Amino acid sequence: MKTVIILAGLVALALGSEVPVKHSFKVKDVDAAFVERQKKVLDLFQDVDQVNPNDEYYKIGKEYNIEANIDNYSNKKAVEEFLQLYRTGFLPKYYEFSPFYDRLRDEAIGVFHLFYYAKDFDTFYKSAAWARVYLNEGQFLYAYYIAVIQRKDTQGFVVPAPYEVYPQFFANLNTMLKVYRTKMQDGVVSADLAAQHGIVKEKNYYVYYANYSNSLVYNNEEQRLSYFTEDIGLNSYYYYFHSHLPFWWNSERYGALKSRRGEIYYYFYQQLMARYYFERLSNGLGDIPEFSWYSPVKSGYYPLMSSYYYPFAQRPNYWNVHSEENYEKVRFLDTYEMSFLQFLQNGHFKAFDQKIDFHDFKAINFVGNYWQDNADLYGEEVTKDYQRSYEIIARQVLGAAPKPFDKYTFMPSALDFYQTSLRDPMFYQLYNRILKYIYEYKQYLQPYSSEKLAFKGVKVVDVVVDKLVTFFEYYDFDASNSVFWSKEEVKSSYPHDFKIRQPRLNHKPFSVSIDIKSEAAVDAVVKIFMAPKYDDNGFPLKLENNWNKFFELDWFTYKFVAGDNKIVRNSNDFLIFKDDSVPMTELYKLLEQNKVPHDMSEDYGYLPKRLMLPRGTEGGFPFQFFVFVYPFNADSKDLAPFEAFIQDNKPLGYPFDRPVVDAYFKQHNMFFKDVFVYHDGEYFPYKFNVPSHVMHSNVVPKH
């Protein structure tokens, strides 16, 4: 007798009863000229792994001659260098691309120069069309994303979510294989059998119910966090951050915010690690583990992921980092860390026309640049051969992939791509390690005095926070860019037939009500932070030990009137969060109405508002909110595109940008509020979907 146990949820799959909720989003109006250019920009993202001879870009790219149009570029030398490099041989099509390999990155920077230095949009589009036809797909996309984000004449243009452009980097291989098989079979043989494996047809497209990774991938406690570390919105957020400020980016050459670049680097990772720590706490995991370059790494990772060409490298638990193959790299990493500590012990750094005093809070710019090892650290007079990147070498060592076979052929690891890095537990351990060194520098800073933190005449009387509730809900994303189309299908403008459905963390909207009494009319800044209340053992956390775990939720200015002021802030209005990205199919429909999604146009580099809160528990997990009010002093510099990070003349994260004295945080312009985060509905996301295998019981062999 053989009994097959199938989850009751499969009935729901077959009936298609679980439909993702469509959330509203803000739109903005655009003119006809914008629409025309926006469509051209979007078209080059479509099905990038194959070219369509029928599309407009193909004919333009085929016929375009870069050298004949050299006068249409503002930096002829950069374009000539690109052409010289291109003629000596470029990354072939259908090879994997990663910016963490020198030759591949140098070529991609050359492609970016071709795009960036185009004098006008027409030249930019023709250059991009040429690259789309002739260059490697991943290399083209990497340079194209950054160029669209950075060019002045494409400001406000919408770029599609990375998970629609690279679906294979945002879903596990078992899900992608179902997509490929359905495409090759032109459908499913048995609808009932397909439903058992999470494949259903809805309207004119197929839906694939996808689980997050389980113990097969994370053969350790890290599997509890896969719903967060594999969230497509979170991983896209990281990709956008790199596109805003690539590590190879020279601020003087490209006009980025040089004076605070290192500070932005630090604050981004500090906030990301704080948010990750929240999720660890609510899952009972506690502090982010530490590791040594000279001891086995405990956290293994077996990614069930693959590019089109190679599977991802796997790292077992207790993997030996300090192997014969890595001796030189480990020595470099260790020396790099010790050199930084020596700089701190000296109290200053002087080299490459830089004089750094580590007692100055502005030294964070140098410190951040040092750990990113970016192009601003040494300046252009230093050759790139002198510079070895701590980040890149650490990623290669921890990724556990074998040495590249040649300059173009390598086995990828999750740490080789910004789209997949956040999946690997060692990513968090590596950047937590970097932050610990930066915190060593922070110890040199004088804590803010009680007088500097005070706001005379202003008192926060009370703070009321609505009930905080998280839940999981389905979301579909288009995976059609991952398949190859026949000539006939290409003529039909690429159908969008395949959608991956996952449960994603979300929360119910909530409001924060703040009662403030002011003695006079004054302009002020109001900040709202979230922080842990207890450690993983249940002991209250002291502020002196917890200052670097505060996660910024909101930042806004307010004109107080003399007397009582009541502020009500809804979570949907919190400054540094955005709506989910809109699918490309919907983007084209909006463009027909001369509209684009506001957040995708203006705020695409922000964290999805879904991820504002960590997953709660049935009984409520304790956290605390902190409201801080201080005088407003605007920063007069042009900060685009970094408004999300820099709003005034205070350091990022102020007042938690340095160690604190607990006693100084008991003032009238501050308020700590205890809160609990609850979870509604299924606690484990895999219960929404099909099991990773069909379970059998009472199996008796026939005699």
UniProtKB/Swiss-Prot annotation:
Sites carrying sugar chains: N72, N211
GO molecular function, one term: nutrient reservoir activity
Keyword Heme attributed: no
SUPFAM superfamilies assigned to the protein according to its UniProt record, in alphabetical order: Di-copper centre-containing domain, E set domains, Hemocyanin, N-terminal domain
Tissue spec: Fat body.
Keyword Ribonucleoprotein in record: no
Span of the signal peptide: 1-16
Source species, domain of life: Eukaryota
UniProt cross-references to InterPro entries, sorted A to Z: Di-copper_centre_dom_sf, Hemocyanin/hexamerin, Hemocyanin/hexamerin_mid_dom, Hemocyanin_C, Hemocyanin_C_sf, Hemocyanin_N, Hemocyanin_N_sf, Ig_E-set
Keywords linked to the UniProt accession: Glycoprotein, Secreted, Signal, Storage protein
Assigned GO CC terms: extracellular region
Alphabetical list of Pfam families matching this protein: Hemocyanin_C, Hemocyanin_M, Hemocyanin_N
Localization per Swiss-Prot or TrEMBL: Secreted, Extracellular space
Protein family (similarity comment): Belongs to the hemocyanin family.
Record note on quaternary structure: Arylphorin is a hexamer of subunits alpha and beta.
Protein's job: Arylphorin is a larval storage protein (LSP) which may serve as a storage protein used primarily as a source of aromatic amino acids for protein synthesis during metamorphosis. It is a constituent of the sclerotizing system of the cuticle, and serves as a carrier for ecdysteroid hormone.
Name of the protein: Arylphorin subunit beta
Lineage, broadest ranks: Eukaryota, Metazoa, Ecdysozoa, Arthropoda, Hexapoda
